[in-house]
Amino acid sequence: MEHNLSPLQQEVLDKYKQLSLDLKALDETIKELNYSQHRQQHSQQETVSPDEILQEMRDIEVKIGLVGTLLKGSVYSLILQRKQEQESLGSNSK
């Protein structure tokens, strides 16, 4: 199945692909940090309450939500900007 994509569409898809790869890398980094932190805590015989972990996860969730919102806004702004450029080029050529 062949898809005919405009350069802008291809660029947006490439950016989403890169974002996906970056999020996967972030996930792996978080897992590694959690694992090393978990090992440190057990070696020091300290325990973290579930409430503390839950609060940290909520903070991370809020930050990720903000990043997602900013990304969506940036993509939307880029699409509008490109559309306006195309319209101005179209009106100038008439």
UniProtKB/Swiss-Prot annotation:
Q: Does the keyword Cytoplasm apply?
A: yes
Report the protein name in the record: DASH complex subunit DAD3
Q: Which Pfam families match?
A: DASH_Dad3 (PF08656)
Q: Where in or outside the cell is it found?
A: Nucleus; Cytoplasm, Cytoskeleton, Spindle; Chromosome, Centromere, Kinetochore; Chromosome
* Further remark: Present with 468 molecules/cell in log phase SD medium.
Biological-process GO terms, alphabetical = attachment of spindle microtubules to kinetochore; cell division; mitotic sister chromatid biorientation; positive regulation of attachment of spindle microtubules to kinetochore; positive regulation of microtubule polymerization; protein transport along microtubule to mitotic spindle pole body
Q: Can you supply one Gene Ontology CC term for this chain's record?
A: DASH complex
Q: How does it assemble?
A: Component of the DASH complex consisting of ASK1, DAD1, DAD2, DAD3, DAD4, DAM1, DUO1, HSK3, SPC19 and SPC34, with a stoichiometry of one copy of each subunit per complex. Multiple DASH complexes oligomerize to form a ring that encircles spindle microtubules and organizes the rod-like NDC80 complexes of the outer kinetochore. DASH complex oligomerization strengthens microtubule attachments. On cytoplasmic microtubules, DASH complexes appear to form patches instead of rings.
Q: Which domain of life is it from?
A: Eukaryota
Relate the protein's function as given in its record: Component of the DASH complex that connects microtubules with kinetochores and couples microtubule depolymerisation to chromosome movement; it is involved in retrieving kinetochores to the spindle poles before their re-orientation on the spindle in early mitosis and allows microtubule depolymerization to pull chromosomes apart and resist detachment during anaphase.
Family to which this protein belongs: Belongs to the DASH complex DAD3 family.
* Species for this entry: Saccharomyces cerevisiae (strain ATCC 204508 / S288c) (Baker's yeast)
